[in-house]
Each structure stands twice: as C-alpha cells, then as structure tokens.
From Swiss-Prot:
Role according to the record: May play a role in mdm2-dependent p53/TP53 homeostasis in unstressed cells. Inhibits autoubiquitination of mdm2, thereby enhancing mdm2 stability. This promotes mdm2-mediated ubiquitination of p53/TP53 and its subsequent degradation.
Biased composition (Basic and acidic residues): 779-793
Species assigned in the record: Xenopus tropicalis (Western clawed frog)
Keywords: Cell cycle, Growth arrest, Ubl conjugation pathway
Family label: Belongs to the MTBP family.
UniProt keyword annotation of Flavoprotein present: no
A GO biological process held by the record: regulation of cell cycle
Protein name according to UniProt: Mdm2-binding protein
Span list, region Disordered: 679-699, 724-793
Keyword Cell cycle among record annotations: yes
C-alpha cells in the first residue's frame, strides 16, 4: 500500500522581534519528517506478493503534504507530493520546489498588505480555512484500500476546542473514512487528552521521525470474527501487518535491475480490504506443505492501541503454540487501471452525514472495479508482543503445484532394491498365467487363423489369373494373425505376478496419506477455502446500501439480512428432516416467513394432498405458497418477464424526458429489441443533452421550436428502440392534430444521428419503404449539422487511439491496425464510461489508451502469428 503522510502545524506567532524570524518548532519537526521520508523512499520494502495472474503489485510510493497555521499565516499543499526519486533527470531541468520550501519562503518573505489584512481575522475563521484545505487534500486521496494515511499534528499547546472544532472535524474525517493514524506531538499532553480520545489519537512529547512513522507497515485495519448462526460479529481495531526486513539497496537500482529482467506480469493496482476475517483454527499437521509459502510477515497492534480489547486479542493470538494456528483472510481487488477517488467518502458527503448528528459513525461502502482475490495468513505466536503471519496459497493460486509436489515426493522417496535380489524380483515380475487362460488363448488363435485362411482362399479364387504358389503368402498371413491375437489376449487377460497372487488374499496394500487425501473428495484442502457465493452477494449488497437512507429504512422495515437470518437452520437441525439416503422424513411444510408486520397466513388444515384434489375455483381462494404460479392459467411467469423487460426500457426514456424538458404525454410502442438502459451505465451521457445545450445558447428560438423538439424527442425514442413497425402519434400542446410518423429501423451505432429523420409537425408526409433516407427534408438544418456530445467524444477517442497506435509503430498500413484500433477503442471506452464530468476528459482518454495499448498490440500480433 502507498504511504501518505500529512504534517499539520498549529502554533501562535511570537510577538517579540527576535523570535519572529526563527523557524517555528513545528516546521522544524516537519523538515525532519520530510528528510526521513525521502530516505525511506530510496529503499525498497518487500510488499505482499501477487494474488492474481492479472499482474504484480507496484512498488510502494511515499507522498507528503503540509498544512501550517502560524498566527494569521496560513499555508497548505495544493496536492500530495510524490517523494519517490526519478530514475533519470535532465541537467537543464530546474528542481521542483517542494511544499515545505514554499511554506518557509512565504513565511520568511510575507506579503505586507496581505499580512496586515489577515491580522483582524479571528481564530475560528482561521481554523475554518484550515478545515477546508484539509478537506481538499482528503478528496485527492486514492480509492480505499490503496493508501496508508498518517497524520502528524505538531502544536506546542492545545487551542480552544470551540475555535478549532471545524479543523478537528476534518481530521476526524480522515480518521473514520480514510483509516488514518493520528499522532499528536505536543508538550501539553493533558490539554490534548479530550481531543485525542475523540480522534483515537496517540499523544507523544518527542518528535523523533523513526518513532512517529513506521516504515515497515504494509497494512492497517481490524480483525473481524463473525458467528454465522446468530449473524453477529466482533471487531478488534488498530491491527497492522509489517514486513520482516527491508532491502538496503536504493530504489532506482532495484528498478533498474527489474527492467533488465524479463517481465512476465505487468504492474497492477491492489486495493486491500479493511479487516482480517477469521476463517478457522487448524492444526499444523493438517496443512499440506505445498500450501505454505516462504512469505512471512508480522502481525501486531499500532501504537494507538496499546491498551483495550485489541491488546487482549493479540495476547490470545500470541499464545498459539507451534502445533496450532489460526487462519485469517484478507480480501483484495486487483485492477489494471486505478479506481477513481470514492465519491461516497468525499468531504461533501461527510458534511451531509455529520449534519444528521449520527450516534455512531459508519463508513459508507465503496464498490471497486477489478478482480476479487484473497490472501490467507496462518497466525502463530512469535513472542515479545508479535505474531508470525505466514502467507498461505489459496486454491486458485495453487494450480498444478500440489500435483507437482506429490510427484517430486514420490520420486525422492523411491529407492531401488539391491542387485542381489534383482533376479528374484525379475522372476516375480514376470506375468503368471493359468492353464485355462493359455487354452482359451490357443482356441481363439486357431479360430482366427482358420477364418483368415478361408478369407484368403476366397479372394485368391476370385482373381482372374490366380498364382499357383502362394505358400509364402499364407505363412506371412498366419504370422501376422498370431501376433495380433496374442497381443489382444495379453491386454485382456489379468497378468499379475506370482508373489502378489499369493498375498492378495492375505493382506491388502496400504494406502499412503497423500493418495487417501486425493481419493477422498471430502478431505480435499480446496474445500476449506471455498466461499459461499450467496453470502458474499448479501455482504456486497449490504455494503452497497447507502448509510444516508435512514428514512427509506423506516419505510421499508428491517433489512433483508435481518429478516432472513431469523429463519436460517443449523446443520444439525436441518439433518433431522432427512434420512441418510437423502429422502425427506415426512411432508415438509413451508416455513412462515415474517415479512415486515404482515405475516403470510396459510389456510388452516391445508396440505399438498388436499390441494391437489380441489377444483381450480376453490384452490384459487386458498392461501398457500406458490399458488399464484401453480394454478394461474394466464402464465404469470411469462407476464412477469415481459413486464420486467417493459419496465427496464421505460426507465431511461421516462427519466430523460421528465428531467430535461416539460412533461408532454407521448404514447409510443416498444420494440422487442434489448433496451439501452440494460446495456448502459448510470454515468453515461444522454444523447438529448446536446439539444438542451443548444437551446440554452439560443433563448430567442425556444418558443418557436418547442413543438418541433417534441417531435424530435419522440422520433429519437423510436430510433433508439429500433422498431420498424410501430406508429407514434405526437400529442401537441395545442388542439391541433399531429400526423402519424413512421420511424425507420436504425443500427445502434447510428442511433445518435437519428435527428436527421425529423419531420415537421405541421406537414403530412407519407414515406414508403423504398424512399431513400437522403430524400427526407428537415426544417432545421442547424440541428442536423450540429455534432452531438456523444459523437464528439467518440471522435476524440478515435483520434487519441489512432495517435497512440502510431506511437507504438502500428500505422494505417499495418495489417493489425484495424483490429488494434477497434479493440483499443472498446477497452478505453469501457474505462471512461463511469466518468461523471467531461473535465479533463482528453487526459483520461490518453491515459486509458496508453495503459492498454501495449497489451492490445501484443494480443493482436500473437493472434496474427497463429494464423
């Protein structure tokens, strides 16, 4: 995970002239921290290995930011500074000025007019400015699971709580929603106790950089132990995973060595989960050796949780002996492109959430793109307050490693016998046949040879000039027949050694442990790591639900997870209802599931047998599970499917029309083609937005063209639905009658240009199928010539893709140009479809195209070579 360090300095300005020009103590501490971080960035720290074939995790980076409030002087970094050194630098290039240098320069050479005008600002307003600057920095943090945030607050004395309350709230935002570790460096420890308890922060007096920043930390989060039967869970916060040792060679030398090696997998982005989930206790003798990897880490608690329940949990884990361990799982999402910052955890959402004054602060769930993977750790006691976390290979990571290890073990354990016993072993290995088997083989051979000779004589007589001497041919035929028959009999008859034949009734051969483990499917180790897909989907739905919808929860009642959890059966309780053969003990009655406050009451004394004997009219009046489908003669399932398809098509068009213009009833028919609402994502740009933009630029033509636009929207609907038979009657706002207009079938890629088929509402035009599209007239040529927003974005993306391919040597004349162009266009468009705004769209297009160009080109070239 990448490390983000934020240094905050709050101090009152000295009034005497001698102390005004000195560097404040808090900024001096920040300089030491910055120097130490630069040293950390030149060292390579071993991280978690790859958990997917998508790629390897990238090298860990360090970022730094500064916020200083010194009297009325206010400074804050505009962005996070990357501290990782560049591999190559140009001689003529000037060094980039860091945020710390800018702060010291602004402090030593202040603007006189600005400085005098800020003297009258109150402390409350200054801290509100600081809070806003801190919120801007928090919005620039990456998606959750990729960054470890450390906040260091340097202040000689504690300010008044009512003055700094807004700034403390900004730090609380970093703590709760970005999992930041807060450390307060101050000599006034007693004054900070109340605020430190609110922030779950650690208050120290010294400012040694090595004590404040732990460079070995790779992950921070909670340990979660859940109980499935009662759907309860317990969390132990402030745990961390640390690397055992760091490599001492510089960062750029490590990168240079990697570039000389053959890179098998690209660098991808890993987003780790927030909790280590307990799986099970296990004996070390039960874990196969090929599941245990060589990667070993340390599990401990952070300095902010030296007391409390987390310390007790760590003591329990440290008590695990060498024979027993606990397995924990850490989830991870792997994506080739970085996920954007989570809007659900932005400063705006934080203010809205805190304005409701919640009792407990909950973290909103964020759905990340990419492949879902897992890390498994075997936790054992190590002593001195640490635990050893050994990385285990999961079932998806093993592939053929298990079979390969077993094969090597058998080859290594094989020991050839002595040469003195070689003769007896050779004789024992000779196949032993009974007399009956030999007699059967000879009878089969004689019958086969007789049939072969008869067939040969028939064919020989059928020849026009038969040869007199055919003794050699018969001799060859009999020899070939004998070889075929004996070979066939030896493959069919049971050939066992004489020694094994004697011992076969005395004792049975012992089965090795590895063979028993593989032959018994119930003991497969892969079964222990398989996840329940249904429970995983429920957890995802629970995380996806917004924490701001408290009013909706009151209307809908309890959540589905709580309602369904009340009717779950334990495994022992479930087995009571079935025999060992899997047959039900009796007629199983459906459980009465409580849905809200209204229970589904069954008809008393009604059983499936009685229900089968009732006529349709009486059975329809009964209340029993599934009657609406079992007794419905109108095909309710088919009607439900048709209604869901109808509803999915209506959603996009209804929201588009009601949100973009005045409500106008337009009856229309839908086509059986799939709806674009199913294929599109919520962040896509509607095609009608370009027309609205044009109308905003021409307010004088709004009234004159309102009727035409009504017809335009209706025709665009029909063009998108792709119907070639439906007729649409356009209802105008006045009393005039609108003629029916036929919408021609358009392909999906030409749906955006359907505005060229608009007909004037005041004219009656009858179009035959043979009339070409070029003969259609339109009253608004400016709407036809105007390029829509989606067309413009597609054109821009095609130009970017073409230029990117030319950079990699794939020109228009290249045989793979067309395939690479289309494939790279589709992939880039897929990564751009979730953008909420078009600001910086061109840069995002270039980034998406350049990140995927090499992979696409390699794919198409390999495909071309195979042809």
């Amino acid at each position: 995970m990448e490390r983000f360090v934020l240094c905050i300095h709050w101090e009152r300005r000295a009034e005497s002239g001698a102390e005004q020009h000195r560097v404040p103590q808090g900024l001096a501490y920040a300089q030491d921290i910055y120097t130490q971080l630069k040293e950390y960035s030149t060292k390579y720290t071993s991280t978690f290995p790859a958990c997917s074939l998508t790629g390897n995790p990238g090298t860990r980076k360090w970022f730094f930011a500064l916020q200083s409030l010194y009297g009325s002087f206010q400074f804050c970094s505009s962005d996070w500074d990357d501290l990782c050194p560049a591999v190559t630098t140009e001689d003529n290039e000037e060094p980039v000025q860091t945020a710390l240098d800018e702060c010291l320069e602004a402090l030593q050479f202040p603007d006189g007019e600005d400085d005098n005008s800020r003297d009258s600002i109150s402390q409350t307003n200054l801290f509100e400015e600081a809070a806003e600057l801190l919120h801007q920095l928090s919005d620039k943090l990456p998606a959750p699971g990729r960054a470890l945030v450390d906040v260091l607050l340097f202040t000689p004395e504690a300010p008044k709580l009512k003055d700094c309350l807004s700034a403390i709230g900004a730090i609380k935002h970093l703590k709760e929603w970005h999992s930041a570790k807060i450390t307060i460096v101050s000599k006034d420890c007693k004054g900070w106790q109340k605020i430190a308890k609110f922030l779950s922060a650690n208050v120290v007096e010294s400012a040694c950089p090595k004590e404040l920043i732990d460079s070995h930390e790779l992950w921070r989060g909670n340990i979660e132990i859940s109980e499935r039967k009662f759907t309860s869970e317990v969390e132990f916060p402030e745990f961390c995973l640390r690397s055992v040792s760091d490599d001492k060679f510089p960062y750029f030398e490590h990168n240079g060595d990697d570039k000389n090696k053959a890179v098998l997998l690209p660098e991808v982005f890993h987003y780790y989960g927030t909790s280590l989930e307990y799986v099970q206790m296990v004996a070390l003798s039960e874990i196969p050796s090929y599941f245990v990897s060589d990667s070993v880490f340390e599990l401990s608690i952070t300095r902010n949780a030296l007391q409390g329940k987390s310390k007790l949990m760590l003591d329990q884990l440290c008590s695990l002996t060498d024979k027993v361990g606990a397995i924990f799982m850490l989830s991870c999402n792997v994506c080739s492109l970085p996920n954007p910052p989570a809007l659900q955890r932005s400063s705006k959402k934080w203010r809205e959430y805190m304005s409701r004054k919640p009792k407990d602060i909950k973290v909103p769930g964020v759905e990340l793109k990419g492949e879902y993977c897992s890390y498994y750790f075997l936790i054992q006691g190590k002593g001195s307050g640490f635990c050893k976390a050994t990385l285990l290979h999961s079932a998806s990571q093993i592939s053929g490693a298990a079979s390969l290890v077993l094969l090597h073990q058998r080859l290594n354990n094989y020991q050839p016998g002595n040469m003195a016993e070689g003769t007896s072993e050779i004789l024992d290995s000779v196949p032993h046949f009974r007399g009956e088997q030999i007699a059967v083989r000879e009878r089969i051979l004689a019958r086969a040879q007789a049939l072969a000779v008869n067939e040969y004589l028939k064919r020989h007589e059928a020849l026009p000039h038969p040869s007199v001497s055919h003794v050699n041919n018969l001799r060859t035929l009999l020899a070939v027949t004998r070889e075929r028959v004996i070979g066939d009999c030896e493959s069919r008859l049971d050939g066992v050694s004489y020694k094994n034949l004697q011992n076969i009734t005395v004792s049975t051969p012992t089965v090795s442990e590895s063979e028993a483990m593989i032959s018994n499917p119930a003991d497969w180790p892969e079964r222990n790591v398989l996840q329940n897909l249904e429970n995983f989907e429920k957890v995802k739905q629970r995380l996806r639900a917004s924490i701001l919808s408290s009013s909706a929860e009151q209307l809908l009642g309890r959540k589905d997870g709580l309602k369904e959890g009340m009717t779950l059966l334990d495994a022992k309780e479930l087995l009571k209802y079935f025999t060992p053969q899997g047959i039900a003990v009796g007629e199983l009655q459906p459980l009465q599931v409580q849905r809200g406050d209204n229970a589904f009451l069954l008809t008393p004394k009604l059983t499936p047998k009685k229900l089968k004997g009732l006529p349709f009219e009486k059975a329809a009046e009964c209340h029993y599970h599934g009657l609406e489908y079992c007794l419905d003669n109108r095909k309710a399932l088919d009607r439900d499917v048709a209604f869901s398809e109808l509803q999915s098509r209506l959603i996009r068009y209804e929201t588009q029309t009601t949100c973009t213009r005045e409500c106008c009833p337009v009856p229309f028919a839908l086509s059986p083609l799939p709806s674009p609402a199913v294929l599109s994502e919520p962040g896509s740009v509607p095609d009608g937005e370009s027309i609205q933009t044009e109308l905003r630029g021409e307010p004088l033509l709004l009234k004159r063209r309102s009727r035409d636009l009504d017809g335009l929207y209706a025709s665009k609907r029909l063009a998108k639905s792709g119907s070639s038979d439906s007729l649409v009657s356009l209802a105008s706002e006045g009393s005039g009658h609108q003629p029916p207009t036929r919408a021609t079938r358009l392909r999906p890629e030409r749906a955006a240009s359907s505005t060229s088929a608009v007909q004037p509402p005041s004219a009656r035009v009858q179009m035959a199928p043979s009339v070409p599209a070029q003969s259609k007239q339109s009253t608004h040529p400016d709407l036809e010539q105007k390029e829509s927003r989606s067309q413009k974005h597609n054109r821009m993306l095609k130009e970017v893709v073409s230029k990117t391919l030319q950079k990699y040597g794939i020109g228009v004349e290249h045989p793979c140009y067309a395939a690479c162009n289309q494939r790279l266009f589709d992939i880039s468009k897929f990564f751009l479809k979730d953008l909420k705004t078009s600001r910086g769209l061109l840069d995002e297009m270039k980034k998406a195209a350049s990140n995927n160009a090499k992979q696409v080109i390699q794919w198409e070239l390999d495909k071309l070579k195979k042809k």
